[in-house]
């Protein structure tokens, strides 16, 4: 089961389910139906049942899903049992905000190292996280065995930095730059373009709200 590939769309929804199951656990709720889950996470119940079906029988007809069992299952699937160290490259405004946030103990993810080209940042500590000079990046990533990097550098530098990350053996890049990176097939990239997301949101407001459809 661990090696079975599931659709990417399903994989993207798993953390959403996991987060809400944690909410249910904190509320001491013992079971949940696909309909209740659907209303909470805004994914239709048929899609939820199909997503869950990739992993076998996770629930019981007429009973729903046992929250504790489902939470334990997804914790394993999402590799939440061990701490994952993440690096951040680019300590500008966005990078600094992410360092301050540092996932706030909500997950098993921690930013444990940061890198920047600015000399005044070299060998300093921000929000409890050491900042290294960019020339030490490849060495530090290898020594600290960091596989995942958050990229918040200016777009003009993005591909060059990505090439260095590949050299360092990084397996995943969360890319906040507007550049679509060219990387080997064994490196996963998730693109987050805040400008695109806002433009899409504005388009939806103008074209898909009740006031705009007349």
Curated annotation (Swiss-Prot):
UniProt keyword annotations, A-Z: Cytoplasm, DNA-binding, NAD, Repressor, Transcription, Transcription regulation
Signal sequence residues: none
GO process terms (BP): negative regulation of DNA-templated transcription; response to redox state
Residues where NAD(+) binds: 90-95
Segments passing through the bilayer: none
Summary of subunit composition and partner proteins: Homodimer.
Function of the molecule: Modulates transcription in response to changes in cellular NADH/NAD(+) redox state.
Name of this chain's protein: Redox-sensing transcriptional repressor Rex
Source organism (scientific name): Limosilactobacillus reuteri (strain DSM 20016)
Chain's gene name: rex
